[in-house]
């Protein structure tokens, strides 16, 4: 298939990159053969208060699970992001902020950010926050979100950031689980020209009968919009920092002390509080940021993720700031007020490195490349993709239209649980194939196993596992260690199970095929839904596609495709048949969709992930009990899909 095309590393990039292919091979080999020695050296990239002497105490044995890194050292994450840059770079810009409205812009130097963080850390202390307390942060994409995180880290409090698009119920469940005393929010946020009622959502969440721990709500004035006020509980951010000292000594934290909680929704049941600790996480986030993006001092780096996701934590706050980078933070969405916004911002801020998601790339692709006619893009050097496998068609569009065919693309695979990037190309070292995450980062040992846990060699397909620990790995599910062991280490003994399927090609490159529950078994043959989706999207009239299995009398499972057409394309039975033939030609008869439903929109979370469990239920005609839809960007999409579903029981 065309996805096998190879994009070679240019000589110019290889010559100037931090790591070329020979260096990658040498360093990778050392990291696997001698992890103690490798990480002893690379752990020094951050500042330690008490240097570590013990590097690694890890085992994936589910009866005796242990994940410890640099575990006798002490440090502070906030000091690593701020204080250590002050002597040489206090005037360097740390954050460039652009509001939802492009007329609103701010620049904050490392010196200024340090002052703001110290003042807010003292403000938190004045409200009774102590080391080990969990602080819930529900903020828009403004610099103060990073200030709040770093202030917590400075005084040893554990932050739990909740994405600003989540509903009151979602907020409540996270506050209850973490027993937060303090919630930090904003009157409103701005996104795509609309005001988002953050404070109102917090008020509603805190009315939940099981929320009993919250004592104070700190409110940032962002829009000046009208809000309700609870005397004695609510306090303005600005009134607290006005009187706070700008000197705040850092709390000395053990490497294995918690840095943050980040909740991920399990496919069922309560959200999982993924717990990351301080030392290993800071080493891994900063190292992956530098090497994966080939970051050079002074470059402008833009990660479009929201601070409420792990990508925002690792690659907008902790990784880049630990490296002294200049980070662009954007409050709104990069395709508002028009699809040209992304290109305008790259040009306006002379962005050198862009890290974004396939869902945005596909959305821009559907609008057409004419929106980039005025885009210059000459500042751009490296481009990344994160969040889900990127289909080859979108990869090539990204490469041609945004990267003008001269920027390497790093298609990164990792998870909330992994803390940082695990499988990725390196710009100066890895020839890329559209759709492949390519090779493991240093210290990462992926393997493919069959359903019995037997390791598969060579070019093959199977369940993606990791054989040994890496410093950025999560340590537990907050308050439920048994769930942690059960979810990740019981399925395949002695291995971390990612929940993803993958194939490895003859070059040793990894291709993520999607969640293992996104595999369709058609007449005894396993088909990754991502593969069928890629084939559909490679048709010029298809903007987006989501594929699920549904019960089929003859095949066991049939293939059900939800297809969004490009703007202006008419739905027709002829086009439906054309798409079925197209997939047949691209993959084979086995992959031909049985049912194709036209979909004006797909059920997505606000980070752009397609919620396939809804699609599976609709395809199976199980439409009475779909479960919680509160995390969807547009819950109305579900109603439309139910009304137009094809698999009704007549």
UniProtKB/Swiss-Prot annotation:
ATP binds at residues 387-389, 411-416, 500, 515, 526. The modification N6-acetyllysine is found at residue 609. Pfam families: ACAS_N, AMP-binding, AMP-binding_C. Keywords: Acetylation, ATP-binding, Ligase, Magnesium, Metal-binding, Nucleotide-binding. It comes from the Bacteria. Acetylated. Deacetylation by the SIR2-homolog deacetylase activates the enzyme. Its cofactor is Mg(2+). The keyword DNA repair does not apply. PROSITE patterns: AMP_BINDING. GO terms for biological process: acetyl-CoA biosynthetic process; acetyl-CoA biosynthetic process from acetate. GO terms for molecular function: acetate-CoA ligase activity; AMP binding; ATP binding; metal ion binding. InterPro entries: Ac_CoA_lig, ACAS_N, AMP-bd_C, AMP-bd_C_sf, AMP-binding_CS, AMP-dep_synth/lig_dom, ANL_N_sf. GO terms for cellular component: cytosol. HAMAP family: Ac_CoA_synth. Belongs to the ATP-dependent AMP-binding enzyme family. This is Acetyl-coenzyme A synthetase. It comes from Shewanella oneidensis (strain ATCC 700550 / JCM 31522 / CIP 106686 / LMG 19005 / NCIMB 14063 / MR-1).
């Amino acid at each position: 298939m065309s996805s096998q095309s190879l994009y070679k590393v240019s000589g110019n990039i290889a010559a100037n990159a931090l790591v070329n292919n020979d260096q990658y091979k040498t360093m990778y080999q050392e990291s696997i053969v001698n992890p103690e020695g490798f990480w002893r050296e690379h752990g020094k990239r951050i500042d330690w208060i008490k240097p570590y002497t013990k590097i690694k105490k890890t085992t994936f044995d589910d009866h005796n699970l242990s994940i410890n890194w640099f575990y006798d050292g002490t440090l502070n994450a906030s000091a690593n992001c701020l204080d250590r840059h002050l002597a040489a770079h206090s005037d360097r810009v740390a954050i460039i902020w652009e509001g939802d409205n492009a007329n609103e812009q701010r620049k904050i130097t490392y010196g200024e950010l340090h002052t703001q963080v110290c003042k807010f850390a003292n403000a938190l202390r004045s409200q009774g926050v102590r080391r080990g307390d969990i602080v819930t942060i529900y903020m828009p994409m403004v610099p103060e979100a990073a200030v709040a995180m770093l202030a917590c880290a400075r005084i040893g409090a554990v932050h739990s950031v909740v994405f600003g698009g989540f509903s009151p119920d979602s907020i409540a469940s996270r506050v209850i689980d973490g027993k937060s005393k303090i919630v930090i929010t904003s009157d409103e946020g701005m996104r795509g020209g609309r005001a988002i009622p953050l404070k109102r959502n917090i008020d509603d969440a805190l009315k939940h009968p099981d929320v009993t721990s919250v004592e104070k709500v700190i409110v940032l004035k962002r829009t000046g919009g009208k809000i309700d006020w609870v005397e004695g509980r609510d306090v303005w951010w600005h009134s607290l920092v006005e009187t706070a000292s700008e000197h705040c000594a850092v709390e000395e934290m053990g490497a294995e002390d918690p840095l943050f909680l980040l909740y991920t929704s399990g496919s069922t049941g309560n959200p999982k509080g993924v717990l990351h600790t301080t030392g290993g996480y800071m080493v891994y986030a900063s190292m992956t940021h530098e090497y994966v993006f080939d970051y050079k001092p002074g470059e402008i780096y833009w990660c479009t993720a929201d601070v409420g996701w792990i990508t925002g934590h690792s690659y907008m706050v902790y990784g880049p700031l630990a490296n002294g980078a200049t980070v662009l933070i954007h409050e709104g969405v990069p395709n508002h007020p028009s699809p040209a916004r992304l290109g305008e911002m790259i040009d306006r801020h002379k962005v050198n490195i862009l890290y974004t998601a396939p869902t945005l790339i596909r959305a821009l692709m559907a609008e057409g490349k004419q929106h980039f006619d005025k885009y210059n893009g000459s500042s751009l050097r490296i481009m990344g993709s994160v969040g889900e496998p990127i289909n080859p068609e979108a990869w090539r569009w990204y490469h041609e239209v945004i990267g003008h065919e001269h920027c390497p693309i790093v298609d990164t695979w990792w998870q909330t649980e992994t803390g940082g990037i695990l499988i990725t190309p390196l710009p100066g070292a890895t020839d890329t194939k559209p759709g492949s995450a390519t090779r493991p980062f240093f210290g990462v040992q992926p393997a493919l196993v069959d359903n019995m846990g037997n390791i598969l060699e060579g070019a093959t397909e199977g369940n993606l596992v990791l054989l040994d620990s890496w410093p950025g790995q999560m340590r537990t599910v907050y308050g439920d260690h048994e769930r942690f062991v059960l979810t990740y280490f019981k399925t395949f003994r002695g291995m971390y199970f990612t929940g993803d399927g993958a194939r490895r090609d003859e070059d040793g490159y990894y291709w993520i095929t999607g969640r293992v529950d996104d595999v369709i078994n058609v007449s005894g043959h396993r088909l990754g839904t991502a593969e069928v989706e890629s084939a559909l999207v490679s048709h010029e009239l298809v903007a987006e596609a989501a594929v699920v299995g549904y019960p089929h009398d003859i095949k066991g499972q049939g293939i059900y495709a939800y297809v969004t057409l490009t703007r202006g394309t008419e739905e027709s039975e002829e086009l439906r048949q054309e798409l079925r033939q197209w997939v047949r030609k691209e993959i084979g008869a086995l992959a031909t969709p049985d049912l194709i439903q036209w979909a004006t929109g797909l059920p997505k979370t606000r980070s752009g992930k397609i919620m396939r469990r809804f699609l599976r239920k609709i395809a199976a005609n199980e439409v009475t009990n779909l479960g919680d839809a509160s995390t969807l960007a547009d819950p109305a999409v579900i109603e439309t899909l139910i009304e137009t579903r094809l698999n009704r029981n007549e």
